[in-house]
Amino acid sequence: MNERNIIETQPERTDLPLIVIPVIVESMIEPFAANFPLLHDIARIRMHCDFTLDTDTILERTKDAEAVIVIGFHITDDILDAMTVRGHVSCFAFGGTGVASYINLPVARERGIRVCN
């Protein structure tokens, strides 16, 4: 982990898709990080090891992401627009239940955005 509390795998591999975990609760850091080797040579991962609900911070952290792992925050229509229309995100993976309460599924489907749980 560096001074900015970010765990990042294979940052030099810009040929690989980038998965971003923009926020996480402390108790989930180690379990997630323990599985990062499974994605070696498949995807780069950038995990921010803190929790915030600040929209601007979340958008800044995900600006280069192709996929976002969502833990504990809602993807409002404005965030969905910023990440998919103006950004590069093509997949949201949710770490919990009730995904339909966290993202507008019809809009995501209409845009061809993959939503996983």
Task: Spell out what each predicted region is.
Residues 66-117:
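Phosphate/diphosphate ligand-binding glycine-rich loop within oxidoreductases
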Residues 1-67:
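N-terminal glycine-/charge-rich "phosphate-binding" loop or analogous flexible N-terminal tail
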